[in-house]
């Protein structure tokens, strides 16, 4: 949908409903993890992709009605990739009236020099970007760094670590940076990628494709993403259930001795988390936990979001 096209009442209604859902998801994540506090200066990392555009739009929207005051500054890292449209983001951000900074660093040249042809560039590229963004956050006096990773990214990372790294480790909604100086937040942690895609299409954001890493075929992350997408089509509700599982961890029923003192279990020990179910069949719900049909979800949105229409 182009910005200059007149949209129908139904399209506007659907867009309003979608924006309210994303706004609710972001608001809940912010509240659950205390992502944003009074007086925060949030550095919004804007890549030019659908996720970061959506994050900026929803944070700007929340800024107008939030019970606390916080400011936003958008930051884009121009990595000097051939053909990168340097004018797109400045024009877009100036039109919005958003404070911004474009950081120019030739990380593209470094990656191409260091990584052999045909090898994945993501690891080195992300390390270089991270250091530059931390430095920029310090220069701008930012108290939080906001990244545009969503629920699907978090699940993909969980499976990547399980399949290839031998760890049950996802992507935290909030963390202290590895240099110990910055707090990183992921406001889209509860948002579905398909909602973000629909919103970005409807808003006609000026998307800038990543020619450095996002287009590389057969990446491990892409394989995982395709697997999860297939599961979502074949088994509705599975994605929601898996994400719910990440929020309901039972250490006593796993095998990590750092999380639970198995050696300390002796006769007379307190029963923990239901005790021994080894000889019983645990009751499994007929429907996936946390899932509901699209129609019911839309009806719930109407009840939850009885607010003034989002413009």
From Swiss-Prot:
One GO term of the biological process aspect: tRNA thio-modification
Motif PP-loop motif: where in chain: 47-52
Record-linked SUPFAM superfamilies: Adenine nucleotide alpha hydrolases-like (SSF52402)
Enzyme Commission number: 2.8.1.-
Pathway where this protein functions: tRNA modification
Binding site for [4Fe-4S] cluster: 122, 125, 213
tRNA-binding is among the record's keywords: yes
Subcellular location(s) per record: Cytoplasm
Stored InterPro entries: Rossmann-like_a/b/a_fold, TilS/TtcA_N, tRNA_Cyd_32_2_STrfase, tRNA_thiolation_TtcA_Ctu1
EC primary class: transferase
Key words, A-Z: 4Fe-4S, ATP-binding, Cytoplasm, Iron, Iron-sulfur, Magnesium, Metal-binding, Nucleotide-binding, RNA-binding, Transferase, tRNA processing, tRNA-binding
Purpose: Catalyzes the ATP-dependent 2-thiolation of cytidine in position 32 of tRNA, to form 2-thiocytidine (s(2)C32). The sulfur atoms are provided by the cysteine/cysteine desulfurase (IscS) system.
Note: The thiolation reaction likely consists of two steps: a first activation step by ATP to form an adenylated intermediate of the target base of tRNA, and a second nucleophilic substitution step of the sulfur (S) atom supplied by the hydrosulfide attached to the Fe-S cluster.
PANTHER family: AMINOTRAN_5 DOMAIN-CONTAINING PROTEIN (PTHR43686:SF1), SULFURTRANSFERASE-RELATED (PTHR43686)
Name of the protein described by the UniProt record: tRNA-cytidine(32) 2-sulfurtransferase
Organism: Shigella boydii serotype 18 (strain CDC 3083-94 / BS512)
């Amino acid at each position: 949908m182009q910005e200059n096209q007149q949209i129908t009442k139904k399209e506007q209604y659907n867009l309003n409903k979608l924006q309210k859902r994303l706004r609710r998801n972001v608001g809940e994540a912010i509240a659950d993890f205390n992502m944003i506090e009074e007086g925060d200066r949030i550095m919004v990392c804007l890549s030019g992709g659908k996720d970061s555009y959506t994050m900026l739009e929803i944070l700007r929207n929340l800024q107008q009605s939030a019970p606390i005051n916080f400011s936003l500054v958008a930051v884009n890292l121009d990595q000097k990739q051939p053909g990168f449209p340097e004018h797109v983001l400045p024009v877009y951000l100036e039109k919005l009236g958003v404070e911004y900074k474009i950081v120019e660093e030739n990380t593209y040249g470094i990656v191409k020099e260091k990584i052999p042809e045909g090898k994945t560039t993501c690891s080195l590229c992300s390390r270089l970007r991270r250091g530059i963004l931390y430095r920029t956050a310090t220069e701008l006096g930012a108290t939080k760094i906001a990244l545009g990773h969503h629920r699907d990214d978090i699940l993909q990372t969980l499976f990547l670590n399980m399949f290839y790294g031998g760890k049950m480790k996802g992507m935290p909604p909030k963390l202290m940076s590895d240099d110990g100086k910055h707090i990183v937040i992921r406001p889209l942690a509860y948002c579905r990628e398909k909602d973000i895609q629909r919103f970005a299409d409807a808003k006609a954001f000026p998307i800038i494709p990543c020619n450095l890493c996002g287009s590389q075929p057969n990446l491990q992350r892409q394989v995982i993403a395709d697997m999860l997408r297939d599961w979502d089509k074949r088994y509705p509700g599975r994605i929601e259930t898996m994400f719910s599982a990440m929020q309901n961890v039972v250490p006593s029923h796993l095998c990590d001795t750092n999380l639970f003192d198995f050696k300390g279990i002796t006769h007379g020990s307190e029963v923990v988390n239901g005790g021994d179910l080894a000889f019983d069949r645990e009751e499994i719900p007929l429907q996936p936990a946390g899932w509901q049909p699209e129609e019911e979800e839309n009806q719930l949105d109407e009840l939850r979001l009885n607010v003034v229409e989002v413009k």
